[in-house]
Swiss-Prot record:
Belongs to the polyribonucleotide nucleotidyltransferase family. This is Polyribonucleotide nucleotidyltransferase. It comes from Photobacterium profundum (strain SS9). Component of the RNA degradosome, which is a multiprotein complex involved in RNA processing and mRNA degradation. Its cofactor is Mg(2+). Mg(2+) binds at residues 485, 491. It is found in: Cytoplasm. GO terms for biological process: mRNA catabolic process; RNA processing.
Length: 707
């Protein structure tokens, strides 16, 4: 074993890349570390593609091992299971910048497996994993047009910070990940606190500039490893056949793309393709149908892009900067806590907001530590939304990714738990889709939260931008359709308020996207966003003054922390009885803050009254109404407040002599008692006869013996 090691400084971090020791049967493998966070990445590529396969089967698996943090997994089996949401999102983060760097004709299966094997709680594994993946692909010999770099950018005290620690991120107004090659940005994923377009663009440029250190280091690493390149060349395109396909289909496809209704257009395009394939096969039976259909797809892309570059109206008849027709409705579901129906052209989202208590918060236990999430956003993309049948089950990677993007867009305007002590769950059901459903979810979420009475800081809208670039000519498109996303060169999603950007996601399929093009896209997106916000504000300009009658109302009270044990009771008996008998949910914090959630005001008031009673201090000399809890030979134990009991001695039951306690008292009987004394051990001495004397002094005086 001859290890090859490359060490370099990346901002404040030391990065080490190593190969040649582990997984030597894989196509390539790299162990990478960044300040005690280590990840092992393997790459395996198949030497031959499956015959007839028309897609690139790239799979990225990212897995966090609990041993990396010195932990043992929970659960019965005590081993890692299916990928968590965080692992799925990181896998997508790795996949997005590397996928466009493989040749479009390359169809061999490639699998990337990244395993986190050691973790420093201050250094998130995602950046070093992206760097390690880039290094592994660079030394694999695969036809990969990399390497790529990766950088996380923070914004603290109006200064950009490279790869901030997790502690620094808590103070940052920006969490932006940018990845690209030496000359081009390929991918951006970010969450921001209403920052300007200029600041966001500067952050992207800053991150791309800083990661050049990584790209140079990987190039040096790959040169030292010196793996021979694969003997792979792209298949030769049959130019004569391509011309025949274009001759038969180009004009018809151009006409079909003037049909503005999606399903009618799809039917016509499908019919044209079938006709052309049948015609060519009739002329020559030796032709390959799959090859013909591939050529038709390429022609379709060329036709649509050519129309856009030439300045013709877009597929649905719009100009380049027009937003589709909007329809905004709130309160569409009677029993949900908040709801909205947001429609933009042929994209529609039914969004609901549900309020719960802090007990409903999601506990996220990862190798980076445990945390609670009080804002949940789930995105569902059923097959019927695109007029198809399909499997319905657990969320796919795309649904998890789109839900996270929508959540990023809203997070900056959500109130803190102190301001609004609820757990909020939003569900976006995509009921129709023709592009930009994640941004429709952002708009629908903002509306549903306002309908639910959640005091968000401002309305949020999202817009998806596209790009078609041919040579030096380019057109930036606002509010792209699904076809424009598929046939274009860039998917650029921006969410924000009137004041600034809250989320930015960018996936670029080609090189040569300049800073100027990104600036145009951001400014065009700003105009579209403000237009959508104005329509949304006409429907509901601010949050409702009150929450839904069906939502739990949370009442907060404070008790002395010494009294917490009294409210909980032995083995939780007191608080369990309180919740069951009042129909409320009660949460107690360590500082004595009690939150009572109830859908009915009377139930909450009763719970508050009983807690106040339980936590009240017993006062010497005060008369209480108590209940006989136990009878003994020398007296009776009577509850004074809640679970607090005191002793009424047999001599304090009545003015006359009492021979037998049970002759005067019964279990459960309510009696008036006066507190005579509380000793050092907290024992309470009570008197029934003193209570009677205090309440009826004249009568008692008459009954006193005369001397």
């Amino acid at each position: 074993m001859n290890p090859i090691v490359k060490t370099f400084q990346y901002g404040n971090h030391t990065v080490t890349l190593e190969t040649g020791v582990m997984a030597r049967q894989a196509t390539a493998a790299v162990m990478a570390s960044m300040d005690d966070t280590s990840v092992f990445v393997s790459v395996v590529g198949k030497k031959a593609a499956v015959e007839g396969q028309d897609f690139f089967p790239l799979t990225v698996n990212y897995q966090e091992r609990t041993y990396a943090a010195g932990k043992i997994p929970g659960g019965f089996f005590k081993r890692e299971g299916r990928p968590s949401e965080g692992e799925t999102l990181t896998a997508r983060l790795i996949d997005r910048p590397i996928r466009p760097l493989f040749p479009s004709a390359f169809k061999n299966e490639v699998q990337v497996i990244a395993t986190v094997v050691s973790v420093n709680p201050e250094v998130n594994p995602d950046m070093i994993t992206m760097i390690a993946t880039s290094a592994a692909l660079a030394i694999s010999g695969l036809p990969f047009n990399g390497p790529i770099g990766a950088a996380r950018v923070g914004f603290i005290n109006d200064q950009f910070v490279l790869n901030p620690s997790n502690t620094e991120l808590e103070e940052s107004r920006l969490d932006l990940v940018v990845s690209g090659t030496k000359d081009a940005v390929l991918m951006v994923e970010s969450e921001a606190d209403r920052l300007s377009e200029e600041t966001m663009l500067q952050a992207v440029v800053y991150g791309h500039d800083q990661q050049q250190v990584v790209i140079n280091a990987i190039n040096e690493f790959a040169a030292e490893v010196a793996t021979p390149a694969w003997d792979w060349t792209a298949p030769v395109v049959n130019a004569e056949l391509k011309a025949r396909v274009a001759d038969k289909a180009a004009t018809r496809l151009s006409d079909a793309y003037q049909i503005t209704e999606k399903m009618a257009r799809y039917d016509e395009v499908g019919s044209i393709k079938n006709d052309v394939v049948a015609s060519l096969l009739a002329e020559d039976e030796t032709l390959d149908e799959r090859e013909l259909r591939g050529m038709l797809s390429s022609l379709e892309k060329h036709v649509v892009r050519g129309r856009i570059i030439a300045g013709h109206p877009r597929i649905d008849g719009r100009e380049k900067d027009m937003v589709r027709a909007l329809d905004v409705r709130t309160g569409v579901l009677p029993r949900t806590h908040g709801s909205s129906l947001f429609t933009r052209g042929e994209t529609q989202a039914l969004v609901t907001a549900t309020l719960g208590t802090q007990r409903d918060a999601q506990i996220i236990d990862s190798i980076m530590g445990e945390k609670k999430d009080h804002f949940l956003l789930h995105y569902n993309f059923p097959p019927y939304c695109v007029g198809e049948t399909g499997f319905v089950g657990s969320p796919k990677r795309r649904e998890i990714g789109h839900g996270k993007l929508a959540k990023r867009g809203i997070a900056a305007v959500m109130p803190s738990v102190e301001e609004f002590p609820y757990t909020v769950r939003v569900v976006s059901e995509i009921t129709e889709s023709n592009g930009s459903s994640s941004m429709a979810s952002v708009c629908g979420t903002s509306l549903a939260l306002m309908d639910a009475g959640v005091p968000i800081k401002a309305s949020v809208a999202g817009i998806a931008m596209g790009l078609v670039k041919e040579g030096d000519d380019f057109v930036v498109l606002s509010d792209i359709l699904g076809d424009e996303d598929h046939l274009g060169d860039m998917d650029f999603k921006v969410a924000g308020t009137d004041d600034g950007i809250t989320a930015l996601q960018m996936d670029i399929k080609i090189e040569g996207i300049t800073k100027e093009i990104m600036q145009i896209a951001l400014n065009q997106a700003k105009g579209a966003r403000k237009h959508i916000l104005s329509v949304m504000d006409d429907a509901i300009g601010t949050h409702r003054d009150d929450i839904s009658q069906f939502a739990p109302r949370i009442h907060t009270m404070k008790i002395n922390s010494d009294k917490i044990k009294d409210v909980i009771g032995k083995g939780g008996a007191v608080i369990r009885a309180l919740t069951e008998e009042t129909g409320t949910t009660i949460e107690i914090e360590d500082d004595g803050t009690i939150k009572i959630a109830a859908t009915e005001g009377a139930a909450a008031k009763e719970a508050i009254r009983r807690i106040e009673e339980i936590t009240a201090d017993v006062e010497v000399g005060r008369i209480y109404t108590g209940k006989v809890m136990r009878i003994v030979d020398f007296g009776a134990f009577v509850s004074v407040i809640g679970a607090k009991e005191g002793l009424v001695h047999i001599s304090q039951i009545a003015q006359e002599r009492v021979e037998k306690v049970s002759d005067h008292l019964q279990m459960g009987q309510e009696v008036q008692v006066k507190v005579l004394e509380i000793d050092r051990q907290g024992r309470i001495r009570l008197s029934m006869k003193e209570a009677v004397a205090d309440q009826n002094p004249a009568t008692v005086q008459d009954e006193q013996p005369q001397g």
